């Protein structure tokens, strides 16, 4: 057997031996994938209900995206931003018009987009709001996940997984301030900080429209309108992290659109499905006024805006538009959540909660009703029966299939979950 076709057993053995152990994957090996289907090296078929954390909204190896990738790869892959390239210019025009913003800054990973936004917010605070130098504050909310870099983990309240032995953290970047906690979904928690003497130094608030890693936590419908109003009142930027929730996943192009706030965010972050899972592509969207705080040399990336990524991202967004995947996610998501709630009612309390929006959903498992079995145990059973999902926070299973999944496969997924719950 060649290295290109390792067995599942050999793959796991080599990864355990040669790779850092910074992940704890389910014991399944991806060999090839198409749409919502995945095959392991031995040919077993699985349904993908994770979508690489919503990076493959368009489905694995979408032909339109792969065609764009292969054609561009034979023409030009990298210029760096030391020179212009004609594909990035097309992407910049396309993505800003697609999402209704004035300007874009391209990066690669979602975490890079977050760091870019934090830097941009600080610069804006000093250059536009006249915050005293080195006093700018950026606030988040408890339970957030914005990535693994220092700025992102400084915002985190998940100490054991995100912060243990990584300190000290970035000053004035936190999801709380002094004695004030900031609970997600509680806009009033920002008020004591914004109205304190230090409130004038708050440059930005960064939030997820739905908290993903926290277990698909959907805020009250009036949360973002209230936060947006507070930001306008106190001259604070609102940064919305749509890296996991955006690009059709919840049934709207941006999840923030569900909340009908009077003002759109000042800064929006995109990643993951921006390339359909083909390449690392991310970006920061904002206004000319805010983005003008970056000047040549103040921020950048060798690979950000490269022609290969730019061409792929255009194709990925074309798929969302042309295949009406926002509408599809809304329609299928409504049916999926209804089926999960029906399953909850028959689960004898094993499923304690169903939550989500569109095709970004989760079920909460109560181990006390499941013979002490956990969400991990249920995911292992589901894997054995051909359905792939991953727990988060021990007792929650995120369910987020590609938006192109068929109704039949979605139904099969629900039936598989039901069967595996009976086997717990």
UniProtKB/Swiss-Prot annotation:
Its EC number is 2.6.1.13. Pathway: Amino-acid biosynthesis; L-proline biosynthesis; L-glutamate 5-semialdehyde from L-ornithine: step 1/1. GO terms for molecular function: identical protein binding; ornithine aminotransferase activity; pyridoxal phosphate binding. PROSITE patterns: AA_TRANSFER_CLASS_3 (PS00600). GO terms for cellular component: cytoplasm; cytosol; nucleus. The keyword Nucleus does not apply. It catalyses: a 2-oxocarboxylate + L-ornithine = L-glutamate 5-semialdehyde + an L-alpha-amino acid. It is found in: Cytoplasm. Its cofactor is pyridoxal 5'-phosphate. The keyword Ubl conjugation applies. The modification N6-(pyridoxal phosphate)lysine is found at residue 272. GO terms for biological process: arginine catabolic process to glutamate; arginine catabolic process to proline via ornithine; L-proline biosynthetic process; ornithine metabolic process. By arginine and urea. There is a cross-link at residue 390 (Glycyl lysine isopeptide (Lys-Gly) (interchain with G-Cter in ubiquitin)). SUPFAM superfamilies: PLP-dependent transferases. Keywords: Aminotransferase, Cytoplasm, Isopeptide bond, Pyridoxal phosphate, Transferase, Ubl conjugation. It is an enzyme of class 2 (transferase). Catalyzes the transamination of ornithine into L-glutamate gamma-semialdehyde, the second step of arginine degradation. Belongs to the class-III pyridoxal-phosphate-dependent aminotransferase family. Present with 72000 molecules/cell in log phase SD medium. PANTHER family: AMINOTRANSFERASE CLASS III, ORNITHINE AMINOTRANSFERASE, MITOCHONDRIAL. This is Ornithine aminotransferase. The gene is CAR2.
């Amino acid at each position: 057997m060649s290295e290109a076709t390792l067995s599942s057993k050999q793959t796991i053995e080599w990864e355990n031996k040669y790779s850092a152990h910074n992940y704890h994957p389910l014991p399944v090996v991806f060999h090839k994938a198409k749409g919502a289907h995945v095959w392991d090296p031995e040919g077993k078929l699985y349904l993908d209900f994770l979508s690489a954390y919503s990076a493959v909204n368009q489905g694995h190896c979408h032909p339109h995206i792969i065609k764009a990738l292969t054609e561009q790869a034979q023409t030009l892959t990298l210029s760096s931003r030391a020179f212009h390239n004609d594909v990035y210019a097309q992407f910049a025009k396309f993505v800003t018009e697609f999402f209704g913003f004035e300007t874009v800054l391209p990066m690669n990973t979602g975490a890079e987009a977050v760091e870019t936004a934090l830097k941009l917010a600080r610069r804006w605070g000093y250059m536009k709001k006249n915050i005293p130098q080195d006093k700018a504050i950026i606030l988040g909310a408890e339970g957030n996940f914005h990535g693994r870099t220092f700025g992102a983990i400084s915002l985190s309240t998940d100490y054991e997984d995100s912060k243990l032995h990584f300190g000290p953290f970035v000053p004035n970047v936190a999801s709380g301030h002094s004695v004030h906690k900031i609970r997600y979904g509680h806009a009033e928690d920002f008020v004591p900080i914004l109205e304190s003497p230090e409130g004038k130094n708050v440059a930005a608030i960064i939030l997820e429209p739905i908290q993903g890693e926290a277990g698909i936590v959907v805020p009250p419908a009036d949360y973002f309108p209230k936060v947006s109003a507070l930001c306008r009142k106190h001259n604070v930027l609102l940064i919305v992290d749509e890296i996991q929730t955006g690009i059709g996943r919840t049934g709207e192009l941006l999840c923030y659109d569900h909340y009908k706030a009077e003002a759109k965010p000042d800064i929006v972050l995109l990643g993951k499905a921006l390339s359909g899972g083909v390449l690392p592509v991310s970006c920061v969207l904002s206004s000319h006024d805010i983005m003008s705080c970056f000047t040549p040399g103040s921020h950048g990336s060798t690979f950000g805006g490269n022609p290969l990524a730019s061409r792929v991202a255009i194709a990925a967004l074309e798929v969302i538009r042309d295949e009406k995947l926002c509408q599809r996610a809304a329609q299928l998501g409504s049916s999926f959540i209804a089926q999960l709630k029906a399953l909850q009612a028959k689960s004898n309390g094993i499923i304690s909660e169903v939550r989500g929006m569109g095709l970004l959903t989760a079920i909460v498992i109560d181990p006390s009703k499941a013979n002490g079995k956990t969400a991990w145990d249920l995911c292992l059973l589901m894997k054995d029966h051909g359905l792939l999902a991953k727990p988060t926070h021990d007792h929650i299973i995120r369910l987020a299939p590609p938006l192109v999944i068929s109704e039949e496969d979605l139904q099969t997924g629900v039936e598989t979950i039901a069967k595996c719950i009976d086997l717990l």
